[in-house]
């Protein structure tokens, strides 16, 4: 069976989309190729790396990438993770489905916010898998 492609997008490809990519590569790897990107690149937030490390997922080798139109056009699903990405997402080919899963931006917030958002993203991906 050919794997489908899921593309997670947020503003800076720094926190939410990085954590989503990390979770999805663990939870969806059997059926999905997983990528993430941003409208801009802000570098991977060290607290996002630490939050994922806390649950045994290493995203320290991830890079902060701009949206790649080749990945978009070959995706089955594009998931925006913040309102900025939802509004500014490039137009998608008709065959690419888009969903918006809004999460708070933990950047600049207390450590507990990174943990909360990380855990909310995991739940969303588990719910997606069970659809």
Swiss-Prot record:
Q: Which Pfam families match?
A: LMWPc
Please give the function described in this protein's UniProt entry: Catalyzes the reduction of arsenate [As(V)] to arsenite [As(III)].
Q: What family does the database annotate?
A: Belongs to the low molecular weight phosphotyrosine protein phosphatase family. Thioredoxin-coupled ArsC subfamily.
Source gene? arsC
Class of this enzyme = oxidoreductase
Name of the protein in question: Arsenate reductase
Disulphide connectivity of cysteines: 10-82, 82-89
| Origin species | Staphylococcus aureus (strain bovine RF122 / ET3-1)
Q: Which GO terms describe its cellular component?
A: cytoplasm
A GO biological process of this protein is: response to arsenic-containing substance
What UniProt keywords are attached to this protein's entry? Arsenical resistance, Cytoplasm, Disulfide bond, Oxidoreductase, Redox-active center
